[in-house]
Amino acid sequence: MKVILRSSFVALCAASLAACGSGGGAGGETRDSVRAVGSSTVYPFAKLVAENFVRSNSDFASPIVESTGTGAGIQLFCAGVGADTPDIADASRRMKASEFAECQKNGVTEITEIQVGLDGIAFASAKGGITMNLTPALVYRALAAKPFGKEQTAKTWKDVDPSLPAEPILVYGPPSTSGTRDALKELILIAGCETDPAMKALKDSNKEQHEQFCTEVRSDGAYVDQGEQDNLIVQKIEGNPNAIGVFGYSYLEENLDKVQGLTMNGVAPTYENIASFQYPGARPLFIYVKNAHLDAIRGLREYVAEWAKSWAKGGPLAAIGLVSSPADVAARSAAAASEFTRLDGAELK
């Protein structure tokens, strides 16, 4: 896929973006290609959709797809309406209520939310490397800065639990701006933290302290932030048999010749286990569409339609690791992709 970046755009029009698209004022220019930004997990799927879109629609320009991380992508998306802002935010978690409010404040009032499929937060090691049956509690005790409110003293996995290997804790994972990191916190770390009833009760009595104790990751080198580069995490663990990597299931699926998935609560990170939500790290993936751009950016409707053509089980996205949504969710997503239903934000947290 040819990637094109534009730096000169028309200023935001007061009336509508479509007015901007008609001629370009203030010495600027409009975009002739769709621009999507966001999740590194969604990136390979969005990129493949873009490539197939160009093959099917040769009269449209190649979409611009950027891996910025979910949080940064939504921030760019919510910055305003106009050709200098993205048309789509790719997200490995649902938009937060605070992000939705920021969008509204900046005039991004018409947003369509589309769940494009499922993914799982995979824990993996090199082929022939360290193996263990992880649980949310074990991961939390190994990675928390203050496990259960106490000082972190574990240096090896055996320090966490006597049944685990006496190898140093070394985990390569996503940065704080990543949707994968958010999902790691929500699905694994908090679940592990709240195995202690006192920590669960703390959520009601002291929300900030609960957030600190349950989600803050240690910074002493046991957890290494690898930026929005999941392929680099694969390379790191491939080169160190005692290291563990955390990334989206699609990267595990893509690299099964090099790495192996670790079980969580005895459940392997497989397509079937993620689709059934038996795997504890299963999560939905989304794209958010800026409806104000639908009639102004050529190809935006068609690009979203290409997503809907691609996400079925056995389709092109499944071939690179996307897990299909349940039938009822997929039906709602297909409707949203054609009708561009407005997100009201009431269910966001």
Predicted regions located by residue number:
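Bacterial N-terminal signal peptides that target proteins for export
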Residues: 1-9
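Flexible loop/hinge segments at secondary-structure junctions
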Residues: 21-349
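C-terminal motif of bacterial Sec signal peptides marking the signal peptidase cleavage site
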Residues: 16-19
